[in-house]
A protein has these predicted regions:
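Alpha-helical, coiled-coil/dimerization segments enriched in small aliphatic residues
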Residues: 93, 209-238
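Short, solvent-exposed loop/turn elements at domain surfaces
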Residues: 36-38, 53-58, 73-77, 205-211, ...
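A contiguous binding-surface segment within folded domains or other stable secondary-structure elements
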Residues: 239-290
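Structural recognition of the beta-strand scaffold that forms the well-ordered cores
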Residues: 44-48, 65-68, 114-119, 140-145, ...
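Short helix-initiation/N-cap motifs at beta->coil->alpha
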Residues: 31-33, 86-103, 147, 234-244
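Secretory targeting signatures
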Residues: 1-24, 360-386
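Extracytoplasmic substrate-binding proteins
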Residues: 25-27, 35, 128-207, 230-232, ...
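A short, structured surface patch at a secondary-structure boundary
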Residues: 46-124, 227-230
Length: 386
């Protein structure tokens, strides 16, 4: 009888302990509609992909137990040092997908992963793929949508809820949502009086890559200017390849050119030092502006995460200063403090935006514009004859 009582007590204790453990877990519904069991407190996060890494950083570097990719120079400059020493687990989706179940199982044993988080644009079969790797690893996988400007604020609220940082999520959502609302209101005032622009992502001799309109990566450019590059064909952040003859035909009001690295200005210098580019009025009149790159990520996107909102503050103030009327330096510093927990110095700001505010002068090595004009007209003439 006594033995039976002991067994019964042990059984009841086990039931109580299991119930307590279950009570510590919670069901979270991700953006794909998947119900995922998460710990009551999520502290150890592994990002899947660069976009997730960017977005999650705003909630604090202490959450990371892995990173999606090795840090570049700009990331090392602006982000917390400890990230550079974390293991790399890669990305589950995209052309550079390297994440695999075996590695996640291994990392989970070493560092204890509460959840793997992917952020971005939802695509076909994502739910099935995440269910599959979750089953193989016994590690929760969650997807959060952040694919358009309108989805940014909600993504921060959702992440704040999942991470148990509701207050921080609300703060970020309010700040990011405020930028988007200001942008939409100001562009209504601009109406059809947009400047025309192209965004040069790469230059290789006569080959020039532009971000085409209606691209996932070109949402801000399409909205804040008349992006006169043809409709995007390639889905990558490098866009599609064109020739200088194509650029002459477009003849944009502004040329936005990607920086080639943190505090590097190779592409800008190539444009300003070229006799061919000198044929364009935008070059002659100082309307070539460089988009900061690796600061810690490219302001124009690639990946197109919420950090690209700083380009709204920047381009709006350059293109339409009477409407986007504010101190740009103060706005950029505020953004870096809010988004990266980084206090940007005046010197860093000046170097990052050295060629990013318009009215730039040609470099001393630039050829006489007339040579470029003749070369450009000749190229256009040949193009028209074809």
């Amino acid at each position: 009888m006594r033995k039976t009582a002991v067994i019964l007590c042990l059984f009841l204790a086990a039931v109580i302990l299991c119930g307590a453990a279950a009570a510590d877990d919670r069901v979270f519904t991700d953006s794909l509609g998947r119900e995922v069991m998460l710990p009551a407190e999520v502290t150890n996060v592994a990002p899947s992909g660069s976009l997730a890494q960017i977005v999650l950083y705003s909630f604090g570097e202490e959450n990371f137990v892995t990173i999606s990719s090795a840090l570049k120079e700009g990331e090392r400059h602006f982000l917390a040092d400890r990230l550079d020493n974390l293991p790399v687990t890669g990305s589950m989706f995209g052309s550079k997908a390297t994440m695999n179940p075996e590695e996640i199982i291994s990392m989970d044993k070493k560092v204890g992963i509460d959840v793997v988080i992917d952020v971005g644009e939802p695509k076909k079969n994502m739910a099935e793929q995440m269910d599959d790797i979750q089953e193989k690893t016994s590690v929760p996988f969650v997807f959060i949508t952040q694919s358009t400007l309108d989805s940014i604020a909600d993504s921060y609220l959702t992440l704040g809820e999942m991470l148990g940082q509701e207050e921080r999520g609300e703060e970020l959502a309010e700040y990011m949502g405020g930028i988007v609302s200001m942008y939409e209101e100001n562009m209504e005032k601009i109406g059809d009086d947009k400047v025309s622009a192209i965004y040069v992502t790469k230059i290789d001799g006569n080959a020039v890559n532009l971000l085409g309109h209606n691209s996932y990566h070109a949402e801000i450019l399409d909205g804040i200017a008349d992006n006169i590059a043809p409709e995007a064909v390639a889905g990558s952040g490098l866009g599609d390849q064109y020739t200088m003859e194509d650029i002459f035909q477009m003849n944009p009001d502004y040329i936005i050119v990607s920086g080639s690295g943190l505090f590097d200005h190779d592409y800008y210098n190539e444009i300003m030092g070229s006799d061919m580019w000198a044929a364009l009025p935008a070059v002659q009149e100082g309307r070539v502006i460089e988009s900061p790159a690796d600061a810690p990520w490219a302001w124009m996107g690639n990946p197109p995460a919420s950090h690209r909102l700083v380009s709204i503050l920047w381009l709006g103030n350059i293109f339409y200063p009477d409407v986007f009327d504010y101190d740009l330096k103060e706005k950029v510093k505020e953004f870096y403090s809010m988004f990266y927990n980084y206090e940007l110095s005046d010197e860093e700001y000046a170097e990052m935006l050295k060629y990013s505010t318009g009215n730039a002068e040609q470099t001393a090595s630039s050829p006489a514009p007339v040579l470029g004009i003749l070369a450009g007209l000749g190229a256009v003439f040949l193009r028209l004859r074809r």
